[in-house]
């Protein structure tokens, strides 16, 4: 199904019973978080708070609180179809040359579609129907959530930050949380390896001392939002990928104060700059780890202009101990990751990021083992293949007879096939999430790989155990008489 903008998605979700309007006045400070958290844990609907306390702008929360709604946002009615999205990305990441005329003919529609999905720039857009400038720019007029009691200030969570490096044609879309520190000031918390931070660094090198243009789009259409959190190949822009998902070009409009292009249907857009020398201490905030994080220094984003649709919707979320919305997104994107990994490592059978592992900190992989040491190759492959797995602390590899999504089977393999000294791999001084306070140094820590596969000659000197299985004929006989047993 195609959704033209966020409002269209909201309307369709409401028809499906996947969205609930809340008419009762609810405070953006703490109350919305508590309500959204209870609903998410129950597998409930998206929420539209129509009367946020002290504000006229409604708040949309828990939008991607189920795997089904993530799939719907990507244009798929069935979550199982997310594997097809992954296959498309795998092909676009490493396209294979045609094997013949027929193969070329079969692949041409996909290639043609990609070529035709460059974003379409429009002159006027809904996101610029209303404009706040000068003294009218006041972030307190927006119902920005204050999520947890220990949070230092309200926090923008679902903003799509748009940047462009000085030597790049394509823009970068990233989602970075932003702490409110004044009527027109936000702290831009982007990590050093993320696209926005890299663009900013390159701009500083190319134009020392000059302000860096930034735009933040709130309430874009679901395909564009999800495109910003999906491992899109570097050769493809997030806008192109969003166009592929919805089957129509992404309409963008140039900002009023700079040349950056933002989704034309966005509900709210923040335009402004980052001055190279202006930084501030960010946090503490409750995060997806379930803890409050440390304070760190990040650049300050000065908002010079706010544009919006008439009667805008403010899109928001919270992060906390799993499950939260990022954890659910991780489960859904898990299905996208599998074909990408299998394209590079055909021996991988399945890949699972347990939501309890804070979205990405632990991965369980099943594989068709072909030689001694094969599991270690897969571990290093997963760590290095996609940027999304740079911060994965634990990788556990099993044979293909283990269902990696069944924790009972994983524990059985772990406790029967692993010798801790032989089968545990430790890698020190690797990049670690700055929010991971367990590491001895901020941003730098160790990783562990666990080989829970059956061991081959060369890996063990002992005779390896044979799994117990019942005789097939006996099982068939018992199946035949089962109803007669009265059990």
Swiss-Prot record:
The reaction(s) catalysed by this protein are: a 4-hydroxy-3-(all-trans-polyprenyl)benzoate + H(+) = a 2-(all-trans-polyprenyl)phenol + CO2
Identify the domain of life: Bacteria
Which InterPro entries did the record assign? UbiD (IPR002830), UbiD-like_C (IPR049381), UbiD-like_N (IPR049383), UbiD_bacteria (IPR023677), UbiD_Rift_dom (IPR048304)
As cofactor, the record names: prenylated FMN; Mn(2+)
What EC number(s) does the entry state? 4.1.1.98
> Molecular function terms in GO for this entry?
3-octaprenyl-4-hydroxybenzoate carboxy-lyase activity; metal ion binding
Tell me which residues bind prenylated FMN. 175-177, 189-191, 194-195
* Residues the record marks as active site: 287 (proton donor)
| UniProt subcellular location | Cell membrane
Kindly tell me the pathway this chain contributes to: Cofactor biosynthesis; ubiquinone biosynthesis
What note does UniProt attach to the cofactor annotation? Binds 1 prenylated FMN per subunit.
This protein's GO cellular component annotations are: cytosol; plasma membrane
For the protein in the UniProt heading, the enzyme class is lyase
GO biological process per UniProt: ubiquinone biosynthetic process
Sites binding Mn(2+) sit at: 172, 238
HAMAP family reported in the protein's UniProt record:
UbiD (MF_01636)
Family annotation (PANTHER family): 3-OCTAPRENYL-4-HYDROXYBENZOATE CARBOXY-LYASE-RELATED, FERULIC ACID DECARBOXYLASE 1
NCBIfam families listed in its UniProt record: PRK10922.1, UbiD family decarboxylase
Say which family it is in.
Belongs to the UbiD family.
Q: How does it assemble?
A: Homohexamer.
Function statement: Catalyzes the decarboxylation of 3-octaprenyl-4-hydroxy benzoate to 2-octaprenylphenol, an intermediate step in ubiquinone biosynthesis.
- Under which name does UniProt file this protein? 3-octaprenyl-4-hydroxybenzoate carboxy-lyase
Organism of origin is Thiobacillus denitrificans (strain ATCC 25259 / T1)
């Amino acid at each position: 199904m195609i959704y033209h903008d966020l409002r269209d998605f909201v309307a369709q979700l409401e028809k499906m019973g996947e969205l609930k309007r809340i008419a009762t006045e609810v405070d953006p400070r703490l109350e919305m978080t508590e309500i959204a958290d209870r609903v998410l844990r129950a597998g409930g609907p998206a929420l539209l708070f129509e009367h946020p306390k002290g504000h006229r702008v409604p708040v949309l929360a828990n939008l991607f609180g189920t795997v089904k709604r993530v799939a719907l946002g990507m244009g798929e009615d069935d979550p199982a179809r997310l594997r097809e999205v992954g296959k498309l990305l795998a092909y676009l990441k490493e396209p294979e040359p045609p094997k013949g005329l027929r193969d070329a003919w079969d692949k041409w529609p996909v290639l043609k579609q990609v070529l035709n999905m460059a974003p379409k720039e429009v002159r006027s857009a809904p996101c610029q129907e209303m404009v706040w400038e000068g003294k009218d720019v006041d972030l307190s007029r927006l119902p920005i959530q204050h999520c947890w009691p220990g949070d230092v200030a309200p926090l923008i969570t679902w903003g799509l930050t748009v940047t462009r490096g000085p030597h790049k044609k394509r823009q970068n879309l990233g989602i970075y949380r932003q702490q409110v520190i004044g009527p027109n000031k936000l702290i831009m918390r982007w990590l050093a390896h993320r696209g926005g931070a890299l663009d900013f660094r390159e701009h500083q090198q190319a134009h020392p001392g000059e302000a860096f243009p930034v735009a933040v789009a709130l309430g874009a259409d679901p395909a564009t939002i999800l495109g910003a959190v999906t491992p899109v190949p570097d050769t493809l822009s997030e806008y192109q990928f969003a166009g592929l998902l919805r089957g129509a070009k992404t309409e963008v409009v140039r900002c009023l104060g700079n040349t950056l292009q933002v989704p034309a249907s966005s509900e709210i857009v923040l335009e402004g700059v980052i001055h190279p020398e202006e930084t501030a201490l960010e946090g503490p905030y409750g995060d997806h780890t379930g803890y409050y994080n440390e304070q760190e220094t990040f650049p300050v984003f000065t908002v010079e202009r706010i544009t919006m649709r008439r009667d805008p919707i403010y899109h928001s979320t919270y992060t906390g101990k799993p499950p939260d919305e990022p954890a659910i997104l991780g489960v859904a994107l898990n299905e996208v990751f599998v074909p990408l990994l299998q394209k590079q490592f055909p021996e991988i059978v399945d890949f699972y990021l347990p939501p309890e592992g804070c979205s990405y900190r632990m991965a369980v992989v099943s594989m068709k083992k072909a030689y001694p040491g094969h599991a270690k190759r897969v571990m290093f492959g997963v760590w290095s293949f996609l940027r999304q797995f740079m911060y994965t602390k634990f990788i556990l590899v099993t044979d293909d007879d283990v269902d990696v999504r069944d924790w009972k089977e994983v524990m059985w393999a772990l406790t029967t096939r692993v010798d801790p000294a032989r089968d545990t791999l430790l890698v020190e001084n690797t990049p670690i999430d700055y929010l991971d306070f367990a590491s001895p140094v901020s941003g730098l820590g160790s990783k562990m790989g666990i080989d829970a596969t059956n061991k081959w000659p060369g890996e063990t000197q002992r005779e390896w155990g044979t799994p117990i299985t019942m005789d097939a004929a006996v099982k068939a006989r018992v199946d035949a008489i089962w109803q007669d047993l009265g059990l």
